[in-house]
Amino acid sequence: MSVQRNANKIKCMEIIKNLEKRGIAGYYCENAREASEKVLALIPDDARVAWGGSATLDEIEVKDKLQVLNAKIIDPSAYSDPEEVRQARTNALTSDVFLTGTNAITLKGELVNIDGTGNRVAALCFGPDKVIVVAGVNKIVKDEAAAIARIKTDACVANAIRLERKTPCALTGQCADCLIPGQTICSMTVVTRFCNKPNRIHVILVNESLGF
């Protein structure tokens, strides 16, 4: 193991300890393959599984493997009709398991997310019986202020481009705190600092750079 990877692992293990203090289960994986396997291990057979938009989940290729669990999939991206998309997002809030990434995680174990529609952070806060969060080491930051700065500088710009949004940041690469109906992806900010239902949230830290 390289010096940098070892340093990343030490940091992850400390964060996992801090997650446990917050009622959140934490796990460490060396790479995307291990992370994908861990996600599958945390999902019961025949579960109703949903997810929020996440480049990290795409990169670990876990969604395509859910068929081995006979999972019942709720996928809003499978629909083009706005009403069907809205209904799928609503149904996701009553799923057995919700999969998501996170925009940032602090050294103290706080999850920080900025959302456009709000369905992703809604499920993180309330609804699904179990939430599984996957995060690469590139998402680790010192504190909440650093998390917001990282998200505004890196994640939101990349996601605006990925989602083909007509926002200033998609054109210039810099956040302009825009207020554009149907386009702005920085609509709400949620900090998850504690889980009142112990181990409802499971965070998998991966010793690779994943997502934005």
Which stretches of residues belong to each language-model region?
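Short, flexible active-site loop motifs that bind/organize anionic cofactors or intermediates
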Residues: 2, 24-26, 137
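Conserved phosphate- and dinucleotide-binding cores of soluble alpha/beta proteins
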Residues: 93-212
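N-terminal active-site beta-alpha-beta segment that forms phosphate/nucleotide-binding
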Residues: 8-89, 94-99
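Glycine- and acidic-residue-enriched helix-capping/strand-helix junction motifs
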Residues: 1-8
